[in-house]
Amino acid sequence: MEFLLSKLFGKERTVSVYITDAVEMQMLNLEYRGKNNSTDVLSWSYYEEDHSALHVGDLAVSWDDVCKQADTNGWDAKTEMIRMLVHGCCHLSGLDHERSKDEETEMLALEEQLLTHLGLPGLYDQFPLP
């Protein structure tokens, strides 16, 4: 996490990570996004409002979704968890792949770069960038 936070935010920062199951994640997703389904990761950024904040935000990760996606993608749950933490931290930095195609491309390219630095190159080779 230190590597991710230093690359994305430039200095020592903190983030909270809450690991839960699909049932609770569905409730959180409904409460905070109005979507009545589980999701892999949710993020709450404090950095977007205050760039001087030491605590940049909170992440919730569904272990059930991590395991399901790992199986679908053909890698282990540890690799998928790292991918979700990278993805969530990119959201904390202010990026959102749902806002526009350009931002989706930017976010996925950044995720690929970070994952490569973490020793996981080529994870998105099977998912071409938009």
Describe the function of each predicted region.
Residues 1-82, 89-130:
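An acidic/histidine-cluster motif and surrounding catalytic segment
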